[in-house]
Design a protein with these regions (language model features):
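Basic, Lys/Arg-enriched alpha-helical interface segments
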Residues: 1-68, 77-81, 88-119
């Protein structure tokens, strides 16, 4: 199994967790099901569930009713998956600002936890 870790800021805030708290019960259940697949399959999880975005950043592709969510993440040492960003997708392609945010959070995480770890 892969260890899923929510990105947290230096202050201890978890933007992904905060976003998930705002979802309704059905949407949270769908996200949880996709996270279970990621936890089980790691980098072997492919489309339609996951895809490479750019560099080390990947996306978990979640469709629930008429909503589409994208959770951006990267793999770190010891089978660790760091979940950096989640968004409600309204356009055909991910916005550059969302990709850049995930990359900044990845850089921040790797700087603070170069060998992996959790808060």
């Amino acid at each position: 199994l892969y260890n899923l870790v929510f990105y947290t800021t230096e202050r201890g805030d978890s933007p992904v967790d905060d976003f998930l708290d705002g979802l309704d019960k059905k949407a949270r259940a769908k996200v949880a099901a996709h996270l279970s697949l990621l936890e089980e399959q790691g980098p072997h999880l492919k489309r339609p569930y996951a895809d490479v975005v750019r560099g080390k950043i990947r996306e978990l592709r979640i469709h629930q009713s008429s909503n589409q969510y994208r959770m951006l993440y990267f793999f770190q040492v010891r089978n660790q998956v760091v979940l950096t960003h989640i968004l409600s997708k309204k356009t055909p392609q991910l916005k550059e600002k969302d990709i850049e945010l995930a990359e900044r959070r990845m850089e921040d995480w790797l700087w603070r936890f170069p060998t992996g770890g959790t808060i």
